[in-house]
């Protein structure tokens, strides 16, 4: 990240010249939840342990996985793949940000296909920028302040998708209990879709069903839809699109990532489905995986193609609600089901308004969801900019751009004995005096 023209008083050195590098010696399972010392592994969170091997100020770099970076001062212990990086005569806070700013360079040659990992040379051999001690302190302080603001902004932005998820469920709740179209209904008198009182449900699983408008009816699922099982051999349809549960995003109704039968290499029997049908995953119904097909294809036998007798989009939206998903997930007991069979699905109640009101509900829901989708897209774009901002600020810091004015105002703090060149000589002397030994270890 320090590539490009640096301030004339800065030095370019290999990181290994500025640090003592070692690793922990323990397995990750050495952690003790009641331990009194921090135990740094390759996980994002810090564990605890009852013994310590280091008593120093250091930066901890996970040697595999997410390559997380932390800093700590005091007694601690470390996992055998965690790198303990101790600064030699430079500020620990500065070293922390230096590693954050160069982590891409450190990990770009990461080895391992399943879990990437790095070696010591990936750390020690990279070139980094070295400013004077005073400027190191200032850079670390500026980065602490600026990136704390960035992280705060990022945290607030990351909360918005969950808020929007709750908003969508609230919209569906109001849609399916009649509140969303209450005023519309007062101005549009429509007869019930199923006028026969004997066909309307009053209870479900020995409990009274929620209240709905007078001209609505609670109907069994099999009264408003048919499950269209049509198993066929996929070998006869190699170029047909194959839809599986993993292609449907939970709670959104969005499908993506699907391929052809041939590309997926499937051989077992599949259901044939058609454009406009509802496709519902019966596996782990609590995941709420349902979509409306926008193409003809074949789907997993673990999915139900459904023909709706009412407005398809209305039934689809009902199947995305918390209420439907709770009923589908628990059947006759409180035990979460691994799958829902046709009998249990057929018995689930569906609140059924007159057809014109179904259309109006669908229109309003889609309008509100489109509004939420627009906000979510804006949030995702903002998050991308925030993530880029972090890297941009780090790049500016290690090109000397954040402290340019300070250098102009404080030439005495970057020259002579206070210079980066003088510091580098002191570091070399310190390394020579210690004989290049690694960090001292103690055990308690």
From Swiss-Prot:
* Record has DNA-binding as a keyword: yes
Q: Which GO terms describe its molecular function?
A: DNA binding
Domain of life according to the entry: Bacteria
Instruction: Give one Pfam family, short name only.
Output: Methylase_S
What InterPro entries does the record point to?
Restrct_endonuc_typeI_TRD, Restrct_endonuc_typeI_TRD_sf, Type-I_RE_S_subunit
What keyword terms does UniProt attach to this protein?
DNA-binding, Restriction system
UniProt entry tagged with the keyword Metal-binding: no
Identify the Gene3D superfamilies for this entry: DNA methylase specificity domains
Q: What does the record list as GO biological process? A: DNA restriction-modification system
Chain coiled-coil ranges:
none
Q: What does this protein do?
A: The specificity (S) subunit of a type I restriction enzyme; this subunit dictates DNA sequence specificity. The M and S subunits together form a methyltransferase (MTase) that methylates two adenine residues of the sequence 5'-TTAN(7)GTCY-3'. In the presence of the R subunit the complex can also act as an endonuclease, binding to the same target sequence but cutting the DNA some distance from this site. Whether the DNA is cut or modified depends on the methylation state of the target sequence. When the target site is unmodified, the DNA is cut.
The family line of this record is: Belongs to the type-I restriction system S methylase family.
Q: What else is known?
A: Type I restriction and modification enzymes are complex, multifunctional systems which require ATP, S-adenosyl methionine and Mg(2+) as cofactors and, in addition to their endonucleolytic and methylase activities, are potent DNA-dependent ATPases.
Its subunit composition reads: The type I restriction/modification system is composed of three polypeptides R, M and S; the restriction enzyme has stoichiometry R(2)M(2)S(1) while the methyltransferase is M(2)S(1).
Domains: what does the record tell us? Contains two DNA recognition domains, each specifying recognition of one of the two defined components of the target sequence.
Q: What is this protein called?
A: Type I restriction enzyme EcoDI specificity subunit
